[in-house]
Amino acid sequence: MEKPVLQTQPSMLPFFDTAHAVNLLRGIHELRAERKFFDVTLCAEGKEFHCHRTVLAAASMYFRAMFAGTLRESVMDRVVLHEVSAELLGLLVDFCYTGRVTVTHDNVDLLLKTADLFQFPSVKEACCAFLEQRLDVSNCLEIQDFAEAYACRELAASARRFVLKNIVELAKSMDFERLSWKRLLEFVSDDGLCVDKEETAYQIAVRWVKADLQHRLHYWPELLQQVRLPFVRRFYLLAHVESDPLVYLSPACLRLVSEARSFQSYEYDRHDRPGHRMRPRPSTGLAEILVVVGGCDQDCDELVTVDCYNPQTGQWRYLAEFPDHLGGGYSIAALGNDIYVTGGSDGSRLYDCVWRYNSSVNEWTEVSPMLKAREYHSSCVLKGQLYVVGSDSTERYDHTIDCWEALPPMPHPMDNCSTTACRGRLYAIGSLTGEDTMAIQCYDAESNRWSLLNSGELPPWSFAPKSVTLNGLIYFVRDDSAEVDVYNPQKNEWDKISPMTQVHVGGSVSALGGRLYVSGGYDNTFELSDVVEVYDPSSRSWSPAGRLPQPTFWHGSVSIFRQFMPLVQSTFEPIDIPEANAIHLHRHHRNQALHNHNNNVNQNHNQEVNQVH
């Protein structure tokens, strides 16, 4: 016979009334309507509001401090408030009892100020939401100032984003011309300034200065520093920027123009000396991309694919395939926004051919061959010219005349060296031929001479080392280790950074956007990898940056700028391409103005000298 199952009675029953808060608020509101249990009266502009201390203290930290502290108001039955109108105090008292308030165009400013004073954060947030919905070109600057004055961070950020997005329309208004110097500098320096091309940013800056030239001229050089002149089109830089008296009468401004010209002629190394001016605004559609060329897949089949990765979108795109058999042992380098692939072999013969990828038309063309066929060499760009370095020879390519010239070879031949340009010199890092120790040699283009550097203890030997320049430092990535060494040419010292998350045997290294990208190769488990990881010098840490389109090794990678569709289409004003005669005329006017300016300076100086005598 089965024993009966005994049912145990629960010892407790947790209960939560979801309607309790609503019912409690309703009850408090009813007590107020019935005028029961009032224990304090608030007065403003002669009008009285009968309230409950507990309700006020629960709704506002201001009133909690008033009634719970040692202030005399804590024991007073009648409290006079001088900082608020009766109408706004009534709105806040009603809010304490109902949780409701009506924000209007007429009361929003004062209501926000009052809510901020009496510490009603939710009312303040409601006012901010109302103002954010009403943002337009006519009030965005005023709302941003107002939001910052009352620590409304989200509203201030929204107003700032609105200004940056609508800067072209805003620049046509009188409010823009009255903009403070500090505020304008913030806008023009922001990456988020929404212009279709950098010329528009220049025009906006010029308009503000010329609106009050006498009082704003001294701000101009610093303001021009925030314009990304390297990305202003060449004809505009010559015919509109350099020819403007604001620019050519200022040595500081002329230096900025010279920097832009150097960048556009590929003499300026943006990786060696990065800066905000070398970074295009996203709205222009110009993006710095990572380009991966060739390599081998998992079956060791040769790839002729060319893929590009845009860090802004996190997407890969196909570019024009390499038109010929790449082979192995080739080298890749970026000269401006063009990519050069040099040499290599098919296993039986060496190549002397050189292929150039023109990013503006997405096309590969063959240029003049090297003076010597070679493989497993290294190439890099120094001062706008392409250098190819082998164990026993060096040559240089001038893209303007499509011509190669022989240079002195390294005094100490190197096997599988890696080259990079840093601080105006070319550095080759590798193992000396026949030795298993690493060495570093330096080429000075001014003296046309190589020298072997004594840089202390170098990194261990590596079969296929890779080096890249970033922020004036040379990052050295070994082929068989996750460790990364850094060489400082100024101090002639080596250091280490955090190791990579995995090894990249046969991987590739490049600099992009002020960060270091390492991709592909075989990992710690000898599996072919598609991992791309990135090193950020500011945080001194590695992080994942996506994956290659497929696992790849022995590929090349470089970074270039490539034009995509601008995010905005409107322009500040029409810009016509000047004819050649017009450019010559601009040059003549500029030279004439400089001549007149110098004459005036000399005359003033002579007058001062005569007065002294």
From Swiss-Prot:
Pfam families linked: BACK, BTB, Kelch_1, Kelch_6
Subunit architecture: Component of the BCR(KLHL21) E3 ubiquitin ligase complex, at least composed of cul3, klhl21 and rbx1.
Pathway stated in the Swiss-Prot or TrEMBL entry: Protein modification; protein ubiquitination
Annotated localization: Cytoplasm, Cytoskeleton, Spindle
Protein name per UniProt: Kelch-like protein 21
Organism the protein comes from: Danio rerio (Zebrafish)
Function field: Substrate-specific adapter of BCR (BTB-CUL3-RBX1) E3 ubiquitin-protein ligase complex required for efficient chromosome alignment and cytokinesis. The BCR(KLHL21) E3 ubiquitin ligase complex regulates localization of the chromosomal passenger complex (CPC) from chromosomes to the spindle midzone in anaphase and mediates the ubiquitination of AURKB.
GO function terms (MF aspect): ubiquitin-like ligase-substrate adaptor activity
CDD domains assigned to the protein according to its UniProt record, in alphabetical order: BACK_KLHL21, BTB_POZ_KLHL21
Residues in Kelch repeats: 289-337, 338-384, 386-424, 426-472, 474-514, 515-562
Main location: cytoplasm
GO cellular component, as recorded: Cul3-RING ubiquitin ligase complex; cytoplasm; polar microtubule
Gene Ontology biological process: cell division; chromosome passenger complex localization to spindle midzone; proteasome-mediated ubiquitin-dependent protein catabolic process; protein ubiquitination; regulation of cytokinesis
Domain BACK, residue spans: 140-242
Keyword vocabulary terms for this entry: Cell cycle, Cell division, Cytoplasm, Cytoskeleton, Kelch repeat, Mitosis, Repeat, Ubl conjugation pathway
Domain BTB, chain residue ranges per copy: 38-105
